[in-house]
């Protein structure tokens, strides 16, 4: 159970364990228990959402936690809290379960929020909170989002 990093052989269908999760539970862990969010790996670091809503940065080679923050996800601990990450140029689009689109820079130095806008109402419920758990689509300089009631499109063009 829990996260682990596999090292794949280049010359054969073989893998070895690079590191495994440490900690007493999913709540008390140093790594990344990514339940719904697909983590993003860049420049030797992993960015993603842990199962209690902690947005984290880890060293990919060792699993060492560099930093974490609840700010981009729900602002506080929340079981199965979620956000989706999409890289765009030098920043990330982060769509959280509150319906916010966040533009941020992620680095081993930390989470730097550039802007945030609420784009769609959370219409579903889980663990006592309203949420939207659908991944947005990006095309033609626009973002497309949906909840259980509607589909919305917003231009992301710089003009």
Regions found by a protein language model. Give the residues of each.
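Noncatalytic, solvent-exposed loop/strand surfaces
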Residues: 1-159
């Amino acid at each position: 159970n829990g996260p682990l990093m596999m090292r794949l052989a280049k010359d054969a269908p073989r893998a070895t364990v690079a590191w495994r999760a440490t900690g007493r539970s999913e709540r008390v862990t140093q790594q990344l228990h990514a339940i719904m969010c697909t983590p993003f790996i860049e420049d030797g670091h992993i960015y993603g959402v842990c199962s209690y809503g902690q947005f984290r940065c880890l060293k990919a080679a060792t699993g060492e936690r560099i930093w974490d923050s609840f700010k981009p996800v729900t602002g506080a601990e929340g079981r199965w809290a979620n956000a989706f990450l999409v890289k765009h140029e030098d920043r990330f689009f982060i769509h959280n379960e509150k319906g916010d689109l966040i533009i941020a820079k992620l680095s081993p130095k930390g989470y730097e929020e550039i802007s945030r806008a609420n784009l769609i109402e959370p219409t579903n419920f889980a663990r006592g909170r309203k949420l939207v758990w659908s991944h947005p689509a990006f095309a033609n300089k626009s973002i497309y989002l949906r909840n259980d009631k509607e589909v919305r499109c917003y231009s992301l063009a710089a003009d």
